[in-house]
C-alpha cells in the first residue's frame, strides 16, 4: 500500500514514521513535507489547499490511500475530491469538518447530542460586543473571559483573560477582520486531548494526552499551536476515559450521521475535567500537534491498516489496539519571537538525531538545515514513567542548537510531581 500524507509539520513526520512501521505500507509520499520528512518519504511541493492539485499528485504517485494531516485542506473539501476520484482517503469531508471549521456548528451538534460544553454566545457585530461581555467572565462569576475566533485560527485565536480591555480588544480585532466571535463560560479543571479514529458511528479511541498551549512556563503568555504534550495521563481514571467515549464522542459521531455529515477520519475532542465531570472545550477534525508525536510513539498496532480500515468502512472489524508500555513526552523547539512573526533562516544543529521530528525546516543547497517556521522541531522522549520520558526528551533537546530558539522546560512536570488530580 502506497500512502500519500498531506502536510508539512512534526505531526506529519510522526505519521510517516508510524506508517513506515506497518508491513503493509510499501511506499511513503508526502506533500509538501519538510527537511526531516524528505529523509523517509518521496517529497512533492504542491498546494495542499487545492483539491485538484492533491488529486493529481495522488494519481501521479499511484497512492492507494491519502492521509490528510492539517485542518485547512479538510475544511476546504480536499478529502471529498480525493474520494470522488476513487482514491481511499482518511479524513472527513467538508461538511463533517465543520466540527472544527465553525465553533458555532460544533456547539449546535453538541447541543443536539446532549453533550456538556461551556455556555456560549456568538457575536457578529461590534455593536453587540460590550453587552455580550457583560454576560460572561467576572460579571457572570467566572474568573476570566474566554474569547474565541469562530473560524480556524491555528490554535492561536483564543484569549483567556481576567482583563476586560484585553478581552474586548481581541473580540473587536476579530470582528474587524470579519470573523464572528464566540464568547464562552470558563471551564475549570485539567485539560485532556483524546483522539478517536471514527468510521461513521464506530469509534476507536487512542491514548489520552495533555498538551501545553501557552508559550511560557507555568502556562503563561500567548496561546500557540502547542509547545509540548505527554501521553498517557497517569492521573486520568479509566472510568472518565470511558465516559468521554460513550457520552461525548459516540453521541457526536451519531449526530453527524443523523445530519448527513458522517465523519470518517480522526475526531479530536479537547476536554476540561471539571468538578462536574468532563466538558468539551473544542472538537478538531484531525490529529493534533504536538499530541500526535507522543501518542504515535507508543502505538504498536499497524497505523496504515488502522487508517485504511476506517477509510473503507471496516473499522468495526479491526480489533483492539496494542500499545507499548510506558510514557512519551513531546517538547517543541520554537523560533525566536514565536508565536509572533518568527525569525527564520537560522541553521539548526543536531536536528537529525533519533527522536527529533521536523516541522518548520528546509534544507539549503549547501546541505544545512535551516528554520522556516514558528515551531521548528519536536523532540520525543519515551520512558517507563513520566519522569523518565521527560528526562529522555530534554536530553535529546540539549544536543540541538537553534539561535534564538526557545522551549518550555515544564512539559509534564506537574503530572510527574503528582500535582494533578480529578
From Swiss-Prot:
Binding positions (ATP):
137-193
Annotated binding of Mg(2+), by residue: 282, 284
The top EC class is ligase
Q: Which UniProt keywords apply?
A: ATP-binding, Ligase, Magnesium, Manganese, Metal-binding, Nucleotide-binding, Purine biosynthesis
Can you tell me which family this protein belongs to? Answer: Belongs to the GARS family.
Which HAMAP family would you find in this protein's record? Answer: GARS
User: What Enzyme Commission number(s) apply to this enzyme?
Assistant: 6.3.4.13
What name does the UniProt record give this protein?
Phosphoribosylamine--glycine ligase
Q: Which reaction does it catalyse?
A: 5-phospho-beta-D-ribosylamine + glycine + ATP = N(1)-(5-phospho-beta-D-ribosyl)glycinamide + ADP + phosphate + H(+)
Q: Which GO terms describe its biological process?
A: 'de novo' IMP biosynthetic process; purine nucleobase biosynthetic process
Q: How is the cofactor bound?
A: Binds 1 Mg(2+) or Mn(2+) ion per subunit.
The cofactor required is:
Mg(2+); Mn(2+)
Q: Which residues form a coiled coil?
A: none
Q: A GO molecular-function term, please?
A: phosphoribosylamine-glycine ligase activity
Q: Where is each ATP-grasp domain found? A: 107-312
InterPro entries for the chain: ATP-grasp (IPR011761), ATP_grasp_subdomain_1 (IPR013815), PreATP-grasp_dom_sf (IPR016185), PRibGlycinamid_synth_ATP-grasp (IPR020561), PRibGlycinamide_synth (IPR000115), PRibGlycinamide_synth_C-dom (IPR020560), PRibGlycinamide_synth_C_sf (IPR037123), PRibGlycinamide_synth_CS (IPR020559)
Pathway assignment reads: Purine metabolism; IMP biosynthesis via de novo pathway; N(1)-(5-phospho-D-ribosyl)glycinamide from 5-phospho-alpha-D-ribose 1-diphosphate: step 2/2
